[in-house]
Amino acid sequence: MPSPRDSECILGENDLQANVFDEKWKKTTKFSEFEDAVNLDQKLNKMGDWIFNFDAKILNIYMVNPTDELINIQDKRCRDLNYYINYVLHYIPKITNHRENSAEIKEKFENFLIGIFSSWKHDRSSKKFKCTRVEKDYTPKMELIKELDDFCENKDAFKAKLKTYDKIKCCKYANHVNNRKSFFHNIISSVPSYKNDLDFHINEKCTLKKFGATFPNVTCNEHNMIEIESDALNITNPRGKLTELQENHLSGTNPEDSFNNSPTKIAFTSVSTILGACISGLYLYKV
């Protein structure tokens, strides 16, 4: 039976760093309006205006007012950015109202992106955000890659906080690892090829290929945390105490398929000469 303090181990809205950044970014850029239209299979009115404002927000976030938060984990924020750009490019033709020219809107957006990414390519400053464009046709599989990337960001953030041990933070961390481990276990069981798919190999510490290392079994004691690398699913109570170990070698078939939707946020930084070019690109939308 759960103890009275089990509720302390439930993840709050501010406990997951990647989620916090994503929600703030989506609100600032109004990305949710675009995403909602996609999810509801509706048209987005005035797509040209929406893209114009979206570009302006990107300029402000990443080129005019970049934060240390973006620069400190710019590799991750760059992957986020590429994810969302590929998402938007994919769905512009699908959700643009028939009264607007979706091909023209998409082309102008692509030209805008060329200007921004070119600025990063030629900027040698180590104090500014940089990002390389990775052009890919958007597929639902990319959502899962993003889910894995977000998990690893949250995992790293938890481990940094746990350098000074706190049992409640530990059991929140354990809950998050267990939840994501179960989720990706189901994914791999449904699509076994994903386990060795290079798209799910973000780095040596964040990869489905090394499942047990990416998703360790976490036990939270009074004064320390124990992590064991294992492909086994760790069934724990909310305080992280091991109650059952269920062996599963990730090679089974026919488990329930569970693909999630979850978009995020992204990162950019500035070069004054290119900033002018990008702003000029914005005005093309108003011609």
Question: What is the predicted function of each stretch?
Answer:
Residues 249-287:
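C-terminal single-pass transmembrane alpha-helix
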Residues 1-252:
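N-terminal targeting/regulatory segments, especially signal peptides of secretory
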